[in-house]
């Protein structure tokens, strides 16, 4: 990512999902999407926002792009997924931010 421009994003989804295997009783919140990146060494991920959302039923996440490895210009869509253990009905929605700008608002 270069500069402070808000990156293009697409294909957002958020859902509560059940655990698998020995974890079948667990519930997880899964958030996924894609972000347009311009360098081969850029990797997108989501982190919990600090401070959190002022609405207790809305989870606020930050879209972060880190760099790793050799640099090389190449425009591409990079997908990512974030999972967080939760309980049923903990959240009504998810808000995804990029440097203080909302890039997605998702209902559960």
PLM region descriptions:
Residues 1-108:
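Exposed, flexible binding/inhibitory loops of compact, secreted disulfide-stabilized domains
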């Amino acid at each position: 990512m270069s500069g402070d421009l808000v990156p293009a994003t697409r294909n957002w989804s958020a859902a509560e999902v059940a655990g698998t295997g020995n974890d079948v009783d667990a519930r997880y919140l899964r958030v996924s999407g894609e972000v347009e990146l311009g360098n081969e060494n850029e990797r997108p991920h989501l982190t919990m926002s600090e401070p959190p959302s002022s609405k207790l039923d809305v989870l606020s996440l930050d879209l972060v792009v880190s760099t790793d490895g050799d640099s090389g210009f190449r425009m591409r869509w990079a997908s990512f997924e974030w999972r967080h253990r939760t309980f049923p009905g903990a959240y009504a929605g998810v808000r995804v931010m990029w440097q203080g700008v909302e890039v997605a608002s998702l209902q559960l």
